[in-house]
Amino acid sequence: MALKAKGAAALDCFEVTLKCEEGDDDDEAVVVAVIPRPEPMLRVTQQEKTPPPRPNLLEAGVEGCEELKQQVSWEQEFLVGNSPGGSGRALCMVCGAEIRSPSADTARAHILEQHPHTLDLSPSEKSNILEAWSEGVALLQDIQADQPSLPSLESGQDGQPDPISNPDPVRMPAEIVVLLDSEDNPSLPKRLRPRGLRPLELPVTPVIEQGNKKPRGQRWKESPENEPARKKRSRHMTKILDPDPDPPSPESPTETFAAPAEVRHFTDGSFPPGFVLQLFSHTQLRTTDCKDSSKDSRAAEGLPQPQNPSSASPPGLRGTLDLQVIRVRMEEPPAVSLLQDWSKHPQGTKGVGTGDKPDWPTVLSESSATVKGQPKAGSGV
């Protein structure tokens, strides 16, 4: 191999040729590459080396970065960050405890006392903790920035959230459906009666002045909202009821009935969600002629007759809980004595029991005489 310069190009580049060792012929030499002369580059490097202040500035910058790195490194090493609330307190990123006098020694002492295993965390794990801490601080700052706008919106609503947009399942009242039924068609079986759910509508009983009574037809014309309740009554009840043209009292079955006190006790919203309550209100019979109809309606429904005629129970309630067969009936006892057929049986053979009064045959005979004057239950059908 030989280096040779040609003419004017000798100052700019070198020509590299490859020659065989056996022969000295120059024609066999092959040009491999032309290398530029490095003289201009050498001159530039010599000029750069002459001004010494530039390397000194770089060294000073590197030293400043190293000092800053040393200053921040202990916080990243021991995972200590500032409080996101802006109070300036130093908090541990692992447990959230406050470090009173923040320094490398106090942070290390805290870690050794509370969670010494965090000293063995890898740099990648520490970087993940630092990143999560910074994201949490940014999120908290965004939430605090949005909080002042919330009271201004709630001020127009008196500080109460909208129950429609944000319903609370715990505070939502239970859905309770109350049905007020006059039981005007007792001839139908219980299973065939309609059980459609309707919203609670308590009809208001009209106030009747005793000094100014009007005929029945005129009162129905003036209060048309009460007319459907009259149309619902069956023929069976209208045949037996007293056809007195005088306006009946509010306790009469022909008048619109009000919800008894038991209904209002079930509408306080104390039931769990999904609870459906159905209540059927019965009215109280007024005249003695209507007492047989009450007994006849019970006989048509197949209900047992109450055995205590002297007790006075409130208007009847019959409730069903969803689809469960739970029925509660508190029927009003018939005013007619249940011993109306007692006169057919001989009374002389009966003796006085232990708990009976000595004059009970006399009471039974008086009761039988009273029943004979009453019409039979099936005479009106």
UniProtKB/Swiss-Prot annotation:
Principal subcellular localisation of the protein: nucleus
Protein location: Nucleus; Chromosome
Bias type Basic and acidic residues, positions: 219-229, 288-299
Disruption phenotype: Mice were born at the expected Mendelian rate and are viable. Mice are however slightly smaller and display reduced levels of poly-ADP-ribosylation. Moreover, they are hypersensitive to ionizing radiation-induced DNA damage.
Record field: compositional bias (Polar residues): 148-158
Signal peptide: none
Segments of this protein annotated with the region Disordered: 148-170, 203-270, 285-320, 335-381
Keywords of the record: Chromosome, DNA damage, Isopeptide bond, Nucleus, Phosphoprotein, Repressor, Transcription, Transcription regulation, Ubl conjugation
UniProt cross-link Glycyl lysine isopeptide (Lys-Gly) (interchain with G-Cter in SUMO2), position: 49, 190, 221, 291, 295
Listed GO CC annotations: nucleus; site of DNA damage
Skewed-composition ranges (Low complexity): 304-315
GO BP: DNA damage response; negative regulation of DNA-templated transcription; regulation of protein ADP-ribosylation
Modified residues (Phosphoserine): 122, 149, 249, 252, 310, 313
Self-association state and partner proteins as the record states: Interacts with SPIN1, SPIN2A, SPIN2B, SPIN3 and SPIN4. Interacts with TCF7L2 in a SPIN1-dependent manner. Interacts with PARP1; promoting PARP1 ADP-ribosyltransferase activity.
Function: Chromatin protein that stabilizes SPIN1 and enhances its association with histone H3 trimethylated at both 'Lys-4' and 'Lys-9' (H3K4me3K9me3). Positively regulates poly-ADP-ribosylation in response to DNA damage; acts by facilitating PARP1 ADP-ribosyltransferase activity.
Stated name of the protein: Spindlin interactor and repressor of chromatin-binding protein
Organism: Mus musculus (Mouse)
Gene encoding the protein: Spindoc
